[in-house]
Amino acid sequence: MKNTVKLEQFKEVTEAELQEIRGGDWRISETIRNLIFPRRK
């Protein structure tokens, strides 16, 4: 059930990131995204 809560919180974060990208703060949102989803090659 905790996964459902995390998804709800993630949706809110995603919407906030989209607004930041529109504002031109794409560097900050990219850093947050990297922290949430570390790139593994």
UniProtKB/Swiss-Prot annotation:
Its main location: secreted. Disulfide bonds: none annotated. One of its GO terms (cellular component) is extracellular region. One of its GO terms (biological process) is establishment of competence for transformation. It comes from the Bacteria. Keywords: Competence, Pheromone, Secreted. One of its GO terms (molecular function) is pheromone activity. It comes from Streptococcus oralis. Acts as a pheromone, induces cells to develop competence for genetic transformation. Residues 1-24 form a propeptide. This is Competence-stimulating peptide. It is found in: Secreted. Belongs to the ComC family.
